[in-house]
Amino acid sequence: MIRVLAILLAALLGFSAALAQTPPAPAPSTDVRVALDTDAGRILIAVHVDKAPVTAANFLKYVDQKRFDGTLFYRGVGASDYGFVQGGAQNDPKRILPPIKHEPTTQTGLTHDDGALSMARYAPGSATGDFFIVLGKMPAMDAQPQQASGDNQGFAVFAHVVEGMDVVKAILAAPKSPTAGEGVMKGQMLAAPVTIRTARRVP
């Protein structure tokens, strides 16, 4: 009997030691995945609803209401592996929703690193349904609180590409129109914009 108890005690101690050595399971991700199916291929993104709740909710509203279906990637700035591509509603009054509150990178902790999605805007708080995808690292687009004058709020990152950066690079490398666009955007508009066929949540 004593021997049986000793064996059970040893087994329990071994089990307890194993539990103590087992690292805790990582917290489940709260990111929402969205597939942008374009004429150039699929771009799969993870939308950070926990870190950028206002901006993420706005983007997902466009997705759920199918407001991105049939829109375009229309702008490409930079080289083939550094810069950004821009797409979305293009201020189409039939597509855009009211502007949202600006969430700077100093608030969200997100940055304009490779594959980041961020909202296009004019003044802070004017973003609606246009966004851009970053290739490479572009810290100048982050909030710059040390900048004493002017707009130092940067752009609002809310998601990252998890698959399909080759598609993003192909869009950026596509030929640009020498005449389309106004002001700083002249020469940055794609000669043949890439259609976003659908934008859908995926598992």
Describe each model-derived feature in a short phrase.
Residues 5-16:
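Bacterial N-terminal signal peptides
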Residues 2, 18-203:
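Cyclophilin-like peptidyl-prolyl cis-trans isomerases
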